[in-house]
Curated annotation (Swiss-Prot):
Gene name, Swiss-Prot/TrEMBL: era
Protein name, as recorded: GTPase Era
Entries under CDD domains matching the protein: Era, KH-II_Era
Ranges of residues in domain KH type-2: 193-278
Family recorded in the similarity comment: Belongs to the TRAFAC class TrmE-Era-EngA-EngB-Septin-like GTPase superfamily. Era GTPase family.
Annotated positions binding GTP: 10-17, 57-61, 119-122
Length: 299
């Protein structure tokens, strides 16, 4: 059996999580069209009879504005250490500019084999894709190949998976074959809730939100009770998330509940509360402990 750890590197919103979801054939990682959706380092495990790949999905590498952003970048860079392969993802719409070269520098410093991935090729013409291909070829050291993909359409995904497997060594099975992530249910539930907030709110609001699961308990009737606090920076943001007559929080709750029910295979009662925690994105205790980034910073 071939096995190994494969990290994804790229600036925010290039489609790293969508690529992993497309490869494993199911939605494990939350996605949205807004940058910096992924905050924590997440392992997604893809096992067949022939291989086990542990995808290490990371926050986008960017110039941070808050302490939260600093920790996100540290988590992403930390994930590049000690892996067997890196997928360096570029958005075909954006091309290769200063932010991409910022990512390339970190990847090159790792001295790890990498595969260049040009994602969202369905949104640009072939000439631009070829230009990006050449820029990646000339910029990425230890590059074993470049694959053109559209994660949303599934284009290039099989070719990418084949190239990943080709570049892994024979090794042990690290996780049980039925395990798809090393994150607990509390983390997955909080991510699903946060994804729905990203889908329904705009501008600064989604980036100002932290979701903390306070309680998970199976009730006597077999329903899984989940109580979650949604923290925001300001009262105005609280009002937006609650919505007129509570319509927004109701929509977020209904959509999140359905997805969590699909995840656990049973009924869920989702109890959401919105609270103001002023300037939480600059408070180390909250970032490291309550939203769980302390473990993400370990090498």
């Amino acid at each position: 059996m071939k096995s190994g750890f494969v990290a994804l590197a790229g600036k925010p919103n290039v489609g790293k999580s969508s690529i992993v979801n497309a490869i494993v054939g199911k939605k494990i990682l939350i996605v949205s069209d807004k940058p910096q959706t992924t905050r924590n380092r997440i392992n997604v495990i893809h096992t067949t009879d022939d291989f086990q790949i542990i995808f290490v999905d990371t926050p986008g590498i960017h110039k941070p504005l808050y302490r939260l952003g600093e920790y996100m970048v540290k988590a992403a860079v930390s994930a590049l250490k000690g892996v067997d392969l890196i997928l360096t993802v570029v958005d075909a719409k954006e091309g290769v500019g200063k932010p991409e070269r910022f990512v390339f520098d970190y990847v090159n410093q790792s001295k790890t084999k990498t595969i260049g991935v040009i994602n969202k090729i369905d949104l640009v013409d072939a000439k631009k894709v070829e230009q990006i291909y050449n820029e990646i070829k000339n910029s990425l050291e230890n590059c074993v190949g470049i694959v053109k993909t559209s994660a949303v359409r599934g284009e290039g995904i099989k070719e990418l998976l084949d190239l990943i497997v080709e570049n892994l060594e024979e090794g042990p099975q690290y996780y049980p074959e039925d395990m798809i992530t090393d994150r607990p249910l509390s983390f997955m539930a909080s991510e699903i809730i946060r994804e729905k907030i990203f889908h329904h709110t705009y501008e600064e609001v989604p980036h100002s939100v932290a979701v903390i699961i306070e309680e998970i308990k199976e009730r006597d009737n077999g329903v899984l009770y989940i109580r979650a606090n949604i923290y925001v920076d300001r009262n105005s943001q609280k009002g937006i998330i609650i919505g007129q007559k509570g319509n927004m929080i109701k929509t977020i709750g209904q959509e999140a509940r359905k997805e969590i029910e699909y995840l656990v295979g049973g009924k869920v009662f989702l109890d959401l509360h919105v609270k103001v925690k002023k300037d939480w994105r600059n408070k180390d205790f909250i970032i490291l402990n309550e939203i769980g980034m302390r473990d993400d910073l370990k090498d």
